[in-house]
Amino acid sequence: AMTDVLSAEDIKKAVGAFSAAESFNYKKFFEMVGLKKKSPEDVKKVFHILDKDRSGFIEEEELKFVLKGFTPDGRDLSDKETKALLAAGDKDGDGKIGADEFATMVAES
């Protein structure tokens, strides 16, 4: 579970901070949720939790539910937010985010 890696309180605060539509900012979110200061192993654990279909990638349809991955009451991202998040993370242009790309996004935040 996400709470094995991150504090439930931090998750609640971070998800709550972006409850308004079109407000999602992944850099601020990863920082607030405490992911930025976690070890590479922990960042990888979070990646695997978000990779719902265990494909080794977070696809666009999984990104839409990224906040739900942190907590069940997180909102769905809008199409615009989802596409912006994908564009920010998908460095090699394959239309999805791999574990290394995810780690880079966290490091950049």
UniProtKB/Swiss-Prot annotation:
Ca(2+) 2 binds at residues 90, 92, 94, 96, 101. Residues 38-73, 77-109 form the EF-hand domain. It holds the Pfam family EF-hand_7. SUPFAM superfamilies: EF-hand (SSF47473). Keywords: Acetylation, Calcium, Metal-binding, Muscle protein, Repeat. GO terms for molecular function: calcium ion binding. GO terms for cellular component: cytoplasm. InterPro entries: EF-hand-dom_pair, EF_Hand_1_Ca_BS, EF_hand_dom, Parvalbumin. PANTHER family: PARVALBUMIN ALPHA. This is Parvalbumin, muscle.
